[in-house]
Amino acid sequence: MILHPSLASANPLHYGRELTALDNLDFGSLHLDIEDSSFINNITFGMKTVQAVARQTPHPLSFHFMLARPQRWFNALAEIRPAWIFVHAETLDYPSETLTEIRHTGARAGLVFNPATPIDAWRYLASELDGVMVMTSEPDGQGQRFIPSMCEKIQKVRTAFPQTECWADGGITLAAAQQLAAAGAQHMVIWARPVLFI
């Protein structure tokens, strides 16, 4: 199980201090949710903040775009060499083209599926994907409660996309992490405040 702490759960008044606290910890990547209220009702980080974070942290960065038209960000992101870029399947008109654009940044490419989104229609992209992320809570900002039935979706992802790395994101507690790992999730984005941001 590889953990990825989410910067969106840090205290926004103390990002610098909380990033420094992570310097000597071992985890997969620092995870940034990019939201502009066009897909979900929240706003997180702009490009200036992302660039500042990239300058300060020694850790690789993974990005989860929860917005319409994520492609607008890719040219600027290429300068900081992200490790992963995930985009929501629900936002894409031409997913294969978008995945190619992600790879041009130097990042590995992944799709994200909301809890209600079936995965079967996306199997044709299996050879173009490095990762698949399952949202394990509704990304609505209303408590981020873990949905246990998403463990079944994790199992389906492992079958449908056997060559990709399987991620889970949303409401993940220690107990939920154990369930998800048993279902086959390899990477987990954690609600980091109680775990790392102390």
What are these regions (language model features)?
Residues 31-101:
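N-terminal active-site wall of soluble small-molecule enzyme domains
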Residues 43-65, 101-114, 148-167:
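Alpha-helix-loop-beta-strand connector modules within alpha/beta enzyme cores
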Residues 85-93, 133-143, 183-198:
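Glycine-rich phosphate-binding active-site loops on the catalytic face of alpha/beta enzymes
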